[in-house]
Amino acid sequence: MSAPAGSSHPAASARIPPKFGGAAVSGAAAPAGPGAGPAPHQQNGPAQNQMQVPSGYGLHHQNYIAPSGHYSQGPGKMTSLPLDTQCGDYYSALYTVPTQNVTPNTVNQQPGAQQLYSRGPPAPHIVGSTLGSFQGAASSASHLHTSASQPYSSFVNHYNSPAMYSASSSVASQGFPSTCGHYAMSTVSNAAYPSVSYPSLPAGDTYGQMFTSQNAPTVRPVKDNSFSGQNTAISHPSPLPPLPSQQHHQQQSLSGYSTLTWSSPGLPSTQDNLIRNHTGSLAVANNNPTITVADSLSCPVMQNVQPPKSSPVVSTVLSGSSGSSSTRTPPTANHPVEPVTSVTQPSELLQQKGVQYGEYVNNQASSAPTPLSSTSDDEEEEEEDEEAGVDSSSTTSSASPMPNSYDALEGGSYPDMLSSSASSPAPDPAPEPDPASAPAPASAPAPVVPQPSKMAKPFGYGYPTLQPGYQNATAPLISGVQPSNPVYSGFQQYPQQYPGVNQLSSSIGGLSLQSSPQPESLRPVNLTQERNILPMTPVWAPVPNLNADLKKLNCSPDSFRCTLTNIPQTQALLNKAKLPLGLLLHPFRDLTQLPVITSNTIVRCRSCRTYINPFVSFIDQRRWKCNLCYRVNDVPEEFMYNPLTRSYGEPHKRPEVQNSTVEFIASSDYMLRPPQPAVYLFVLDVSHNAVEAGYLTILCQSLLENLDKLPGDSRTRIGFMTFDSTIHFYNLQEGLSQPQMLIVSDIDDVFLPTPDSLLVNLYESKELIKDLLNALPNMFTNTRETHSALGPALQAAFKLMSPTGGRVSVFQTQLPSLGAGLLQSREDPNQRSSTKVVQHLGPATDFYKKLALDCSGQQTAVDLFLLSSQYSDLASLACMSKYSAGCIYYYPSFHYTHNPSQAEKLQKDLKRYLTRKIGFEAVMRIRCTKGLSMHTFHGNFFVRSTDLLSLANINPDAGFAVQLSIEESLTDTSLVCFQTALLYTSSKGERRIRVHTLCLPVVSSLADVYAGVDVQAAICLLANMAVDRSVSSSLSDARDALVNAVVDSLSAYGSTVSNLQHSALMAPSSLKLFPLYVLALLKQKAFRTGTSTRLDDRVYAMCQIKSQPLVHLMKMIHPNLYRIDRLTDEGAVHVNDRIVPQPPLQKLSAEKLTREGAFLMDCGSVFYIWVGKGCDNNFIEDVLGYTNFASIPQKMTHLPELDTLSSERARSFITWLRDSRPLSPILHIVKDESPAKAEFFQHLIEDRTEAAFSYYEFLLHVQQQICK
C-alpha cells in the first residue's frame, strides 16, 4: 500500500528490543521531457493480458485482510493474523508471462471509456512493527547456472534430552538480549554488411552503467532501535533551499529526486539525503555493425553476412582470467556537467549533512548541509529537453544533443510526468553545448533548487495507427491470448505474426501443482527437534516460480539476486512476513560468456529509459511495451534485422531480447569527453616501519612480473610516489638515463614539482620504470624516519590524478602521524574482549571522507593496502576507499620473513589486483517495476543522485546491496522486473554498458512469500544493515536487531501460516537455516563480543561485509567444513582434465570432529586443516609428508606435492576451492591439542563458547522470546 507523499505513519512495535527497519523512499522519477508520455491506464505487467487472474496471484483471497490504517501489535507478542491461502496458492496460480506478441482487441474503444489504470488516491501505508520494513536489496550470486533447488534430506535425529543443551542463566550476559573486450572490426568502413568475428579474448572490461529506479525516496517511520538503512551524509558549507509547502513537496516527489521525511513522537527524524555530483565520462562510438564471439586464445575470424541494411553487432565474449580493459573518461573543464533535478529538504532536517554514501547514514552529522549538486530551474528544463530530443532508441546520429551529465547520458525518468508519446515526432534536439564554455566539474556542487514538474499529456497521445499494408506472413492467432493494450485500436484488425515470450502465458497453468499438498520450501520444520539441519550439499539459490522458458531467460543469481523470489503484492503483506526485501548485485563479475552488442541503435524505453530485455512485450512488429513502466515504444527500423539469424522482421529474436545479461558498445551519446588513458599511481609508505616489514620487495617484484599485464592500451600511464615525513616524486620522463627523485618537504602546502613528468607512458618509459622498481626496495634500507605523512601524500596524489582520473594504490603500514589527516590511537587493548560497548567503529576525522569525495568527482578511486602489526585506525583510513569506489586489503601482523603466509598471500593478491579487469568513470543505476522503490544502498561508491551511483573504478570482485520498499500495490501485475545498468569505460578506451535484468512473480499469499525466501540473500542483506546499525548506533543494538529478525520472522510464520503446535519452534523449510546463519553472523568478527578482537580486525570484517559479493560473504559468515582423510572419486566432478572430489558438508560442531580424521574448513579468506591426534599415519605420510602425528610441525602452511593418490585428491580439492575466489586464501594446518587450534574452534558456530550460545541454546532463546 502506498501513502501520500509526505505523510507519516509511525511504525507499531511488538517488542522493546530493536528491529531492523529502514527509511523508505517514495515518489516518482523526474520527467525526461516532452518526448515521452505517461504509462497507459490499463492492465500493468509484462505478462498481464485479458485473462482471468487465478487465486493466489493478483487478487486478494477472500480471507486476506488489507487493513486501511496502521498495523499494530500487542506489546507482548505477535498479533495473530488471519491465514492467507497458504501453500495451496503457491503453485495453483497462473503467472501471466510477458507477451512478446499480443493480439489487440476492441476493448475501450468507445469515447470516454474508462482507462484500466487510472490512479486513484493512494491507500494508507502499513508499516511493519517488529522487524520494521526490510526494504532493501543487493544482488550477487555464486553459481553460473540457475538450477532448481533440490530439496535436501535432513537427518532427523531428535535430541535425546534438552539437558544436553540447556541454556543457563549465565548466557544472558553473553551479548544476547535477555528480552527479546573486443573491437568489432569491420572489414570495410561503414559497410552495409555486418562482420561476424570470433576472437578469443575474454569478455573483460565490461562494466556498464547501473542506475536505480526513478522513484524518489521517502523516509519511512522506523523504530528507535531499528535498522534505519540510512546512508551517511556529509556536510557542506552552503545552506539548503527553504522547505516547500506540503503540497509542493508532494509535487516535487514526482520528479524522482525530492526527499520526503517523516516525524513521529519520540523518534528522531531521519532522511535519505541523496545528492548529485556530476562528472563526465566518454565512450568510443562504433558505427560498424559486427557480431563478435571473443575468446582468449584465437584470433578474430571475419565472416561477412549480407543483411538488407546496416545492422547491429552482437558478440559473445568468453572471459578468461584477464580481460580486455579500457580507458575511462573523467570530466574536464572543457566539458559540460549536466544539471540535475532538485532535492527538497524539510526544515527539520536542515541540520543533516547533504551527501549520501551507500554504506552508512549518520544523523549526527554536522549542521551545515549542502547538497553536492549544481542545478537550477533552467538547467533542469535543459536536461529534460535533451532527453526529449533523443529518440526511443539511442543512436549515434550527430543530430543527437551532447549530454552534459551522467544522469542525462543514462537517462532517468518515470512515465507519469512525461508529456509526449513514443511515436509522436520527437522535438528538435537541443543545441549541442559548446565544450569550450562548459563548466568544469566541481567537487562540491552548488545547492539544488526545487523545480516544479511539468504537466503530462494523456497516455497514447499522438500514437499513429498501424499502416494497413503491414500484414505480410500472417500467422494464426494463439488461442487464449488476449491483447495487453486494449486502448490501441488502430492495429486491432491485424493478426499476430510472431510468437514470443508473451505467448507463454497460455501454458503457465502447467505450473500448478494442486495435487501436491505444498511445495518443499513450505514444509514445516521443527527446529528444536531436527538436529541435522544443514544439508550435505551446498545451498543453491532458489529458482523463481516462473514458466520454464522464463526461467531460462532470467538473470543468473550469481549476478542479480533478490531476498524474496516471490514479491509481496503490498507493503502490508511484506510487513506481515517480517522479512527483508532487497537486491544483491555482482554486476561486473567475470563471465565465461557475455553477448556483446555493437549497434547504431540501443533500444530503450522513452519514459523510464529501460533497456530492451527478454521480459518486454511486443504488441506487434513495430511496437513494444516496457516491462517496468508499461509505456509503448516504437521498434527502430534497424532493430528489425537479426544479425544472428540473418533474418528480417523478427525483433523478438534479437539477442537483446533473448539474453538477460548483455553488454552494449556505447556510442558517443554516452560520453562526456574522449576516453582517457588508463592511469595507475602507486603511493608507497617508506618509513622505518614499512622498510622493516619488507613489503616493498614483494610489491616491486610483482609489478616487474605483471607490468605488461596491466589493463590498458598504448596510452597507459603510470607513476610512483613514496612518503615518510616528506613526499618523494619520481621523474620518469623518456630520455632520462635514470629515475630522478624529487623531494617535497613542505607537507602543509603540497605542490607538484614537475606535473608533466610524474605520470609517464608505460611503454615509452618502461626501462626507467623497471630501474626504479629494482632500486626501490634498497633505497630506504637505512632510513630512521618513523613518521608517516599519509594525508599530504594523498593530497598530492589527488592533484596529480585530477586531469585524467584513474586508480591510486596506497600502501600504508602505520598510523598517520604528520600533516593533514594525522590520527591518534583510539584502541584500548583491555577492551578487546568487552561484552559491553565497542567504541570507535566510525572515523575519527572527516578528512579522508572529504578527500575521497573530491577524488570521486575527478574519477579517481583509491585502493588501500594496510600492512600493519599495530593499530592503524582502519575505521578512519577506510573512508578513502569507501567513498571513492575503491578496495580495501588488510594484512595484520604482516612481515616478510616472520609471517611468510601473509607475504605469500600479498604476492598472490597483487597478481590478481594488477591483472584483473577494470572499468573507469563508471555509473550504475538500478531500475525496477513501477510501484517498487529503492531507499538504501550498500557498497563502496558515492551516491550522486537518488538512484545514480558514482563508481570512479569498477572491478569484478565488487558486490553491492540495495534495500527495497513497495510504494504502490502490485495488484495490477503478476510479474515485476529489476534492471541494473553499468556504464563504464574499458581499459581499451571503449564506452560500454552492461545490463542485467531479473524477473520475479508477484504473490498475494503470505505462504507464497515464505515459500520464496532466499535465506542466503536475506542474511547478507541483514549483515549490511547490521554494519550500518553498529556504526550509527551501537554494536549491541545491531546484535539485538539481528536476534529480533529471527524472532519476528518465525513468530509471524507461526501465527499466520503454520497450523501446527505452537509450543514447538517451527519454520518453513525455506527459513530453516535462518537462525543458524544469524547465530553465525553474531559470532563473526564484525559482531562478536566477549572474544578478544582487535578493533582494526573488526572494522575490516565490516568493510568486507559491505563490499563482498554474496558467494564470498557467505563463506565468511558460515564456513564450510569437509572431512578430507577419506576422499574418494564418488560424486567427483571433472574440471580441466582433473578429477575433483566432492566430500559432503559437515555441521560446524566439534561433535563432527573425530581424532581419527582430518578436516578442512573453508572460511573464504583462510583455510584450516585440522588433524586429529589419532589420524591415520597413511594420510599423514601420503598427504602431509610426515611419518606420524608428532612429526608434523606447529606452523605448516603448504601441502607438499606428493606422488600419491591421496595427495592428488586433497590438492585437487583445495585448488578447486581456491580457484573459485578472487583472492588467495591462507592455508593453516592445525594439529589437535596445539595452541593454534583456538582460532579453528572459534568457527565451530554450533558449539557454545564462554561468551555465546550454542545453536540449540540459541533456538531455545528465540523460542522463549516468541512465547513472551
From Swiss-Prot:
The modification Phosphoserine is found at S1224. The keyword Cell cycle does not apply. One of its GO terms (cellular component) is cytosol. Keywords: Acetylation, Cytoplasm, Cytoplasmic vesicle, Endoplasmic reticulum, ER-Golgi transport, Membrane, Metal-binding, Phosphoprotein, Protein transport, Transport, Zinc. Residues 225-234 have a biased composition (Polar residues). It is found in: Cytoplasmic vesicle, COPII-coated vesicle membrane; Endoplasmic reticulum membrane; Cytoplasm, Cytosol. Residues 376-389 have a biased composition (Acidic residues). Residues 605-629 are annotated as: Zinc finger-like. Residues 1-71, 216-263, 303-345, 362-451 are annotated as: Disordered. One of its GO terms (molecular function) is zinc ion binding. CDD domains: Sec24-like. This is Protein transport protein Sec24B. Residues 426-450 have a biased composition (Pro residues). It comes from Homo sapiens. It is a peripheral membrane protein. Residues 1-14, 21-48, 245-255, 311-332, 365-375 have a biased composition (Low complexity).
